[in-house]
Amino acid sequence: LTIIITILQPMLWLVMYSSVAGSTMQNTGIKNYTAFILPGLIVLVSFGVCSSGGIMNYLMKNDGSFYRILIAPIHRSSIVLGQLLEAVLCSFFEVTIMVIVSLFFSVRIPLNISIILYIIILIFLMSFFMAGICYAISLILPNEVMYETVMNAIVLPIFFLSTALFPANNIHGALAIAIHINPFTHVINILRSFILYERLDIGQMIFVMILFMI
């Protein structure tokens, strides 16, 4: 159920929004708009999965299982790591579904194994980073209502203040600065460069990886 809920919105963006906006965006030089927005939707899917991991903490607290886990003879860091890795694995599962569906909309994923390995590492670090943030926020806030409000206040600006839906070439001023300092803009650009041009910006890749590992 969680997988269906978290992937539903990005899937609607992929299927419906790309079809409607694709013809308009062709005037900007974007030939395959579905391929263009796929990287941003991959980030959105990861955010959704990691956010749902925080919701699970509240559900576990309500039924008492959260506190039973705390008194179990297991190191607490192992418990946290297990929950974070669960979110990462779910992210990979949903990203895989998104990529498979995108193939039916004329998206062609380059079969460059070496670059794909780098992309897998990037998605892993990004998902692990987001899962850690969501987990920490869920431990701080008292209930799921506040948690969902805060997560929406974080996710939506990050998504829209990026290059997820449009190129940032002709954007200037404060909006351009906000887009360029958004770390997920760089993740999206790396994924897009691979999907559209089968290229990998090693410098940008290293920068983002270091940022997520801090």
Q: Where are the predicted features?
A:
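Membrane-interfacial helix-loop-helix junctions in multi-pass membrane proteins
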Residues: 24-27, 159-213
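Aromatic- and glycine-rich beta-strand/loop motifs that create alpha-glucan
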Residues: 1-11, 64
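Hydrophobic alpha-helical transmembrane segments of integral membrane proteins
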Residues: 6-7, 35-36, 153-154, 159-163, ...
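Alpha-helical transmembrane segments and their short interhelical loops
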Residues: 76, 80-151, 198-214
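Short amphipathic alpha-helical coupling elements at transmembrane boundaries
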Residues: 64-71, 142, 152, 176-180, ...
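Hydrophobic alpha-helical transmembrane segments of multi-pass membrane transport proteins
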Residues: 12-16, 33-104, 134, 153, ...
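Short helix-capping/hinge motifs at transmembrane helix termini and TM-loop junctions
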Residues: 17-26, 48, 102-110, 114, ...
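Transmembrane helix-loop-helix hairpins at lipid-water interfaces of multipass membrane proteins
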Residues: 7-33
